[in-house]
């Protein structure tokens, strides 16, 4: 990435980060108000999913958690590269830390087609901020009867907590993906889109049994709220 493109990318990400940080705060306030007014206990069921995962992580997944996290990590590279960047995937590899040979610290990799030495920040940093299994569950939630939503929301909370553990483990300065894109740019990108994705998820599970709000309704609500807030700031500046 040239210095000019890097500067423009960082500048736009900083602007976007300011917006998504404010909107994340608004999203949290929305969730708190919804819980206080007892509109739907979806957030409660997500919380149950968080607790179930923490218990499972400690007592049931201990032997295989590293390869599960590696598969999720490499799966994000593959998903974004194949679906959004239209790359051809040649190889997908994931292994447990127990299988590493002496001097080898590579738990997994994805081999794909790309043009020259071009590095896509989208696919390179996808594992650090894209909870793709959670979004797939939110799409699956569209097909579920209202009476069964609590079960799905527990699983959604379970999957999201899994990603929190993955992000905590993988997001390090010495991580090869982060070093490849640059530490400052990487953290800026990761934080920005992590807040963005979490906001969409929080909106998507609101409503529920009384007034179901699905992933598409959540996305719409997020962008409508964001646009209204931007217009409010513009009006304040003009006046």
Regions found by a protein language model. Give the residues of each.
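Transmembrane alpha-helices and immediately adjacent membrane-cytoplasm interface residues
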Residues: 48-61
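Helix-to-loop transition at the C-terminal end of transmembrane segments
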Residues: 58-65, 208-213
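Membrane-water interface of transmembrane alpha-helices
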Residues: 82-86, 90, 166-171
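Active-site recognition of the HExxH zinc-binding catalytic motif
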Residues: 65-85
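Metalloprotease/metallohydrolase-associated module, dominated by Zn2+-dependent proteases
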Residues: 1-32, 37-42, 48-49, 96-239
């Amino acid at each position: 990435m040239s210095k000019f493109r890097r500067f423009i990318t960082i500048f736009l990400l900083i602007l976007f980060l300011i917006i998504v940080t404010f909107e994340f705060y608004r999203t949290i306030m929305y969730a708190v108000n919804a819980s206080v007014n007892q509109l739907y206990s979806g957030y409660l069921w997500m919380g149950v999913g968080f607790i179930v995962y923490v218990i499972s992580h400690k007592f049931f997944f201990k032997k295989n958690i590293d390869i599960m996290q590696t598969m999720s990590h490499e799966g994000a590279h593959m998903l974004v590269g194949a679906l959004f960047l239209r790359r051809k995937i040649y190889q997908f590899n994931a292994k447990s830390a127990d299988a590493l040979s002496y001097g080898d610290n590579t738990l997994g990799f994805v081999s794909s087609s790309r043009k020259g030495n071009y590095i896509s920040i989208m696919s390179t940093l996808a594992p650090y901020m894209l909870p793709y299994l959670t979004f797939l569950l939110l799409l699956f939630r569209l097909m579920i009867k209202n009476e069964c939503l609590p079960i799905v929301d527990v699983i959604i909370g379970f999957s999201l907590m899994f990603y929190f553990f993955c992000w905590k483990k993988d997001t390090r300065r010495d991580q090869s993906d982060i070093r490849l894109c640059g530490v400052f740019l990487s953290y800026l990108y990761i934080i920005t889109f992590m807040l963005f994705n979490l906001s969409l998820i929080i909106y998507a599970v609101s409503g529920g049994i009384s007034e179901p709000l699905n992933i598409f309704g959540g996305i719409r609500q997020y962008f409508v709220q964001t646009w209204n807030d931007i217009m409010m700031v513009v009006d304040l500046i003009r006046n």
